[in-house]
Amino acid sequence: IYSLVTEEDISYSLKSRKRFAHKGTFGHALLIAGSKGKMGAALLSAKACLRSGAGLLTVHIPTRGESIFQTAFPEAMLSLDANPDYFSTVPEIGSYSAVGMGPGLGQHLESAAAIERILQSSTKPVVIDADAINIMASNKDLFNKIPPRSILTPHPKEFDRIAGESTNSYDRLMKAQSFAAEHKICIVLKGAYTAICSPAGNIYFNSCGNPGMATAGSGDVLTGIILSLLAQDYSPETAAVVGVFLHGTAGDLAAAFRSEESMIARICSEKRLSKSNKSSKNNGRFYSRLLQLLPLFHILYGLTVYI
């Protein structure tokens, strides 16, 4: 089945926040990210995770990053690796609602061994991105150890490292569909009209986003969003589809308020979401739910929206 994802689809997929909920209601996410020179990727992903609604977040980082996180993002709890510069030791993961790994991780031999232990020990789906994908592409046996219903988020070059060079975009898409079904995972094949391939063979095409989002840090933010949704007990397929759409919508709002060329992962701009958008018959439900997530836009593109 091939589907184009719309605002209406997303509006009915988003969960409401119950008045008597507490932070435990919205899950505890574990993000394994960052290495020497790449702590910014971990920080962007972590902020996106909490801004997307996760109740609690623990970030496993090299010890070198402790002062960075404690200063820049005090809301996140830290799990410190034994290595000062990169991921080498596996934290206890049994108590977390969802696990994500990859942003800024680096590609070290000890990291590869630690990733294998994560895959073998996790009883929950794992979001796998960036350097975690690259490590696995160099150790293809690791793909047979991915927990079912996990989510891979490769861009085209990363996917080609996994499945081999593709002759064109359609060839790559068919490979992604087959790979997702074979390994019983979701694949988020990033790009224009990002395609989400489900284990059942369904493909969902995202209908929003723009070229301004092709910028450093954008993928790290997407990982944080999807991880957050998984922690909040969305199904992996729904977390991937909703996460990609929210990410694209944030980019479209930012592009409307600034040029695509000027978009970076933390531009500051101030614009208003018009009341007509919020109240229109067709978009009202979507935007009323979207307003709950407006702080996310500030993290993705520095977008501060006043209502």
Predicted regions and their residues:
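Small-residue (G/A/S/T)-rich helix-start motifs and N-terminal tracts that mark the onset
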Residues: I1-V127, N134-I151, P156-I307
